[in-house]
Amino acid sequence: MAASGRGLSRALHSTPCPAWKRVQSGANGCLKPEYDAVVIGAGHNGLVAAAYLQRLGVNTAVFERRHVIGGAAVTEEIIPGFKFSRASYLLSLLRPQIYTDLELKKHGLKLHLRNPYSFTPMLEEGTLSKPPRSLLLGTDVAENQKQISQFSRKDAQAFPRYEEFMKRLVLAIDPLLDAAPVDIAALQHGSLLQRLRALSTLRPLLKAGRTLGAQLPQYYEVLTAPISKVLDQWFESEPLKATLATDAVIGAMTSPHTPGSGYVLLHHVMGSLEGMQGAWSYVQGGMGALSDAIASSATAHGASIFTEKTVAKVQVNSEGRVQGVVLQGGEEVRSRVVLSCASPQVTFLELTPQEWLPGAFVKRISQLDTQSPVTKINVAVDRLPNFQAAPNAPGDQPQAHHQCSIHLNCEDTLLLHQAFEDAKGGLPSQRPMIELCIPSSLDPTLAPTGCHVVSLFTQYTPYTLAGGKVWDEQKKNTYADKVFDCIEAYAPGFKRSVLGRDILTPQDLERIFGLPGGNIFHGAMSLDQLYFARPVPQHSDYRCPVQGLYLCGSGAHPGGGVMGAAGRNAAHIVFRDLKNM
């Protein structure tokens, strides 16, 4: 649907040139034949790795195949006048050290913290001239309890205890995110020096155990059990359980009844922004502004970033060691090391010469679970959605609930499970799980005056439809129409407000952003693909079977989300190895 109609008459402002591009046009903007390090892909992890390496004195170049940096953390003006965080759309998980070390605030990063942060309207008839109920959650404990007590007084009393329980688990796991997993191979078979070094990798794990103490069995259950079982032990009201369960299935082809879904919930509550645990924010200017800030930090110290430069091949010498990359145009760029921010599948099955990779390793990479349930729909509207459960104020000004993640079709965990079952049968969900966000409610720079950008993160849509059918434009639009019908039931008039939309199925997410299977994490965040086993067992320390080749994207430990930890951790491993070469 093309953008048209009201609100688009305002002259469009030209987007200012990001600071990293202004620096890039200088001396470090020319492609050199050799660098110390080459990074494949300017996703946020690749940019973080480059920024750290350059600060450590490692001359680094980043090659990005698209015209824009950021990978999935990108801002694109798909519809004239409307700037969309086209894939990733919220910030919380970015490691605090990265925010500080790279001086991202100095390099232009501005955040809009959300409080309240979650809104779940009910699809029910109002009573006695009152609107339908809704659940609004934020950082105010008393207000949360008041909201929850609409559905269960018992749950209102339990909720603060639940949050404290989860915070302790987050505190335990937090140190594991900022270091490579325990080096089991070195502990078992390494030299004395290697074993001594490997002992240090045990510290975060031991610290986690001490933090959990006698409650370790209960926390183990959170990580391994279905999240529905965990939530049933705490609560009785379905709206609260379903709202919390969305964090356990977001981006995952799993149901709340799937064992291990608890970790994905934990993954989405372990963030911290500006000292606020669990806070989520919109980035001023969209998620691409975060990538621009990281790039600015990198180029300010001398890193080179090139767009529309596709790496076609990792070069390996006759001794089995990396010696650089070959670009799509045939240009050879030599380097001592190569870091890949691309997915494990692209890195090892497409870019790396297969003769240098063990067959067992290639087989494991090819068998990684990359199922994705996600279709992302970016929408331009000429007015705010008007929810029956929380009618708009006169003047159509954003209210507290408009800044939240708005959960639709989430009144009951059974709805989430049924939506999952549809997709397992090869069909788009009849009642999709919808997370609706309106970043322009806090950041008016994203849309023309009076208009808004709406992000719809929807599940569940299979990569391949029943009968082996693929997503064509008709099927995409039919699904989007179904999503809009669902929103219309909660917010009548929504469909009339739509000026344009951008529909990204799992196949689109793979094609445009390089997300394997459309999986936003570069691979499932299931326990069999985490920590020791990410991307595969014995290769969780960012190093690869080819000497000098490293994985630094979301397919490496600790996984997906706009976290930057994989890029930071890999950079430190690379720097240590360079010193020992």
Curated annotation (Swiss-Prot):
Keywords carried by this UniProt record: FAD, Flavoprotein, Mitochondrion, Oxidoreductase
Record: residues binding FAD: 38-71
The name this protein goes by in its record: Pyridine nucleotide-disulfide oxidoreductase domain-containing protein 2
Function: Probable oxidoreductase that may play a role as regulator of mitochondrial function.
Subcellular location: Mitochondrion matrix
An MF annotation (GO) of this entry: oxidoreductase activity
Enzyme class, UniProt record, top EC level: oxidoreductase
